[in-house]
Amino acid sequence: MTQVLLNPSLEEAYHFLVKNMYNNLITLFGDCEIQYEGRAYSHASLASRLIIIKVDGSVIVHEHTKREPINWQPPGSVIVVRKESGVLSIESIRKRPKERLYIILRRLYYLTSAEVNSGNFDIKGTEKDIVDLVLENPNLIEEGFKPIQREYRIPYGIVDLFGYDKFGTPFVLEFKRSKATLQAVSQLHRYYMFFLESYGKARGALVSPGISEKALNLIEKLRLEYIDANRIFDSITNSSRYTINISNIQRS
């Protein structure tokens, strides 16, 4: 079921969010200011923005240009909605690492709630194909990434891709073509520890089109990183070498 409110009052929006945001996907468009406190500090002045709130606690804020959001919070964040004097606030709190996203809404143009179910996401291609893409354009991982060797053999196995970040830190990358699990995180951690002990510093990242909640929690606990492979797939959707199928999506 999908519900839509056009030009809702702050009072209407508050009750709508409290009723729906824990079970449905929420999208809203309105005039807002944003404050972020955590690993850094940022402030976004009053402007019209698109805000997406997912059932798992994810919050994403977009402006009118670029693919990447200007602010976001990951799954597992705690969301609190308050109706204050002349504004509606949405606060997203992440406990570890400690981060806080505070959105102050002064006007809403529309607000939607929808039941969205998960579908199958199949990628016709291997980890090798994805690594090939990264080797062609290392910045798909991050700016300044320098790949050194693929299938790098160490005592604990074969690393999919080894390189250095822009600061010269050894960077270990493990690629998965499907949703990453706890086993994938454990595998990456073994590789990461080898390079940490060998070089005194290291980074390790798991690259996949999805990750389980338990695996993501373990990634954060072990101070590893997760890279959403969908960012990479976005750049190749017009390539004949790959087919991306999203099926079994249920619509009400």
UniProtKB/Swiss-Prot annotation:
Gene Ontology cellular component terms for the protein in this record: cytoplasm
Pfam name, any one: NucS_N
Enzyme Commission (EC) number: 3.1.-.-
GO molecular function (one): single-stranded DNA endodeoxyribonuclease activity
Entry keyword Cytoplasm: yes
EC supergroup of this enzyme: hydrolase
Transmembrane feature ranges: none
Keywords: Cytoplasm, DNA-binding, Endonuclease, Hydrolase, Nuclease
CDD domains for this protein: NucS-like
Entry's localization field: Cytoplasm
Stored HAMAP family: NucS (MF_00722)
Job of this protein: Cleaves both 3' and 5' ssDNA extremities of branched DNA structures.
Family: Belongs to the NucS endonuclease family.
NCBIfam families, sorted: PRK04247.1
Protein name per Swiss-Prot or TrEMBL: Endonuclease NucS
Organism from which the protein derives: Sulfurisphaera tokodaii (strain DSM 16993 / JCM 10545 / NBRC 100140 / 7)
